[in-house]
């Protein structure tokens, strides 16, 4: 790869030219990394619901043409000036949020919300010069959340790149770049269930299943899945879920159903849907005195919810989390090691694999609700 250092690389990328239209495989030019940046050769990427959301232009600022993708694994091709923690040949995971290492958030043991590199879905350019590193015949193509992994090569801020064990299979650990860590960490790092405890998981999509996996790893004995789609329950058993509640099948609030099932409430609840009603239910279903509810799902812009202050005064705790409270550069390598040691199971999240030329199939699988994670293999 060294003969490309400092040069423009021509490669294939899946370009979204307009909202909701199939991606088109195009030849793009990828500029070399500037100071503080890294150019990665992407080997495997996967589709996350966030990609679909912004591809459908439901986000704040639709930007097209754009190269989506933010869950991926690859190899460092070259680094820009001042980058010291990475070198060509390193195996790495790009992440939609970063760790500059210098801001108050990065210096705090409690936060992963870097001031400089926190997720920005509206920005389609690099921080350095407010320009794109992608172009087609001279026309700039927008970046997406600083990663744009639906390209054989991409340029990412060095603070958003985690160096990982080179023995880790990139076609498996690539899914740790977003959704799996978001759910897993919400349980392990934020809810912190004790062995033998009870945990309710609201929403059994990819993030909710990852939250359930976190409860399984933590040793929870009762893992209650809550979802409006009963067909999801069978699959969820693979992730440690051993009891199920469909709110539509009851004539009382689901928090009351769960409280009755658990002699007053669960020890922990993790909400992974973004639904206001689910947030209220998750908080109100935890036991007084010690119960902790964690919000993961992203609500709509103008949403608000109310609950009685006595729920707090009775010693219930409500927390929020972002990317599972993991610092990307510091913590992600350790999550990869959890997988390498057999503590974390990733294979069960991967339901489909497609070649890069058939990337639109991944969108079809997700839109039909058929996939948890679809791996897109860049080299064919």
Swiss-Prot record:
Keywords: Cytoplasm, Metal-binding, NAD, Oxidoreductase, Zinc
Example GO biological process: formaldehyde catabolic process
Residues at which Zn(2+) 1 binds: 48, 50, 70, 178
Domain of life: Eukaryota
Catalytic activity annotation: a primary alcohol + NAD(+) = an aldehyde + NADH + H(+); a secondary alcohol + NAD(+) = a ketone + NADH + H(+)
Family: Belongs to the zinc-containing alcohol dehydrogenase family.
Name of this protein: Alcohol dehydrogenase 1
Protein's organism: Pisum sativum (Garden pea)
């Amino acid at each position: 790869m060294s003969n490309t250092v400092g040069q423009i690389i021509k490669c294939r990328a899946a370009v979204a030219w307009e909202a909701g239209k199939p991606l088109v495989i195009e030849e793009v030019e990828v500029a070399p990394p500037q100071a503080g940046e890294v150019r990665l050769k992407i080997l495997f990427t996967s589709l996350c619901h966030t990609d679909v959301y912004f591809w459908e232009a439901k986000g704040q600022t639709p930007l097209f043409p754009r190269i989506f993708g933010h869950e991926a694994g690859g190899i460092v091709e070259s680094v820009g000036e001042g980058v010291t923690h990475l070198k060509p040949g390193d195996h790495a995971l790009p992440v939609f949020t970063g760790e500059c290492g210098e801001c108050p958030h990065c210096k705090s043991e409690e936060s992963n919300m870097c001031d400089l590199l926190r997720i920005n879905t509206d920005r389609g350019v690099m921080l350095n010069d407010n320009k794109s590193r992608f172009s087609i015949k001279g026309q700039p193509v927008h970046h997406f959340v600083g990663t744009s992994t639906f390209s054989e090569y991409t340029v990412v801020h060095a603070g958003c790149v985690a160096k990982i064990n080179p023995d880790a299979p990139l076609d498996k650990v690539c899914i740790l770049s977003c959704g799996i860590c978001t759910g897993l960490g919400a349980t392990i790092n934020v809810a912190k269930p004790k062995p033998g405890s009870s945990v309710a998981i609201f929403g059994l999509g990819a993030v909710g299943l990852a939250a359930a996996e976190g409860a399984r790893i933590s040793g929870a004995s009762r893992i209650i899945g809550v979802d409006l789609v009963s067909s999801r329950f069978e699959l969820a058993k693979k992730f440690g879920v051993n009891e199920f509640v469909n709110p539509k099948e009851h004539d009382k609030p689901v928090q009351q159903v769960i409280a009755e099932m658990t002699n007053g409430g669960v020890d922990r609840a993790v909400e992974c849907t973004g639904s206001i009603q689910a947030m209220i239910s998750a908080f109100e279903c935890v036991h007084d005195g010690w119960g902790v509810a964690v919000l993961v799902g992203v609500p709509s812009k103008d949403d608000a919810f109310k609950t009685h202050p006595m729920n707090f005064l009775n010693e219930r705790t409500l927390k929020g989390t972002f990317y599972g409270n993991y610092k990307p550069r510091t913590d992600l390598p350790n999550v990869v090691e959890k997988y390498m040691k057999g503590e974390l199971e990733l294979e069960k999240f991967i339901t489909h694999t497609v070649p890069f030329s058939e990337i639109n199939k991944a969108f079809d699988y997700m839109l039909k609700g058929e996939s948890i994670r679809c791996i897109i293999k860049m080299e064919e």
